[in-house]
Amino acid sequence: MMGKNDNLIEDYRNLVTNTLLANPTIVEVLSDGEYSLEEADELMWTHIFPNQYIPDTITETGSFILYDLSDAVISRVNKTYIEVTLYFWVLTHYKMPKYNNKLRNDILVRELRKDFGEKDCFGIAKAHYVSNSIFNSGTNKYTGRLITFRVTDWSDRIRYKD
């Protein structure tokens, strides 16, 4: 029996997207205070990208969140489970590092840790915070962080949600 999607990554990606768009602080920082939660969808593909993709043609300053997932089937004696790793790349243009006198990257990382760290955000198990490291965006116009979480899906519960 399969759930909504036959692709586990797609299921998780949808949950991550919805969580990001429901966070008022993330919406405020990414939109520079211009969007409310009701307008949060406008951030998709402009400031929120559901894959590790940095468009060559970004001309605006501000902050961006990119995210992606990987999964692996782990087999142990008499047990098989899926381990999902969730990656967030937080990027901010060097001309706009601050929002309300705080570093944008720090604000966004804090919110990601609140929304995903040590929480059962996927309805299957706690997402464990793994790392927060410096990320080089490949261009000297953006400062970046790479935040990683790991979730172990012991029973493939995401697929059985209604």
Regions found by a protein language model. Name each.
Residues 80-96, 142-156:
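Oligomerization/assembly interface segments of phage tail-like spikes and tubes
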Residues 1-75, 162:
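Small/polar-rich, solvent-exposed N-terminal microdomains that initiate assembly or binding
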Residues 27-28, 58, 62, 103-162:
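Acidic-leaning, charged glycine-interspersed low-complexity segments
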Residues 79-83, 91-114:
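Extracellular/virion structural assembly segments
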Residues 16, 20, 65-67, 86-88, ...:
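Hydrophobic beta-strand residues in large extracellular and virion-surface proteins
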Residues 73-74, 79, 137:
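Exposed beta-sheet edge/beta-hairpin loop segments within beta-rich domains
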Residues 69-72, 91, 132, 151-152:
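Generic short beta-strand segments
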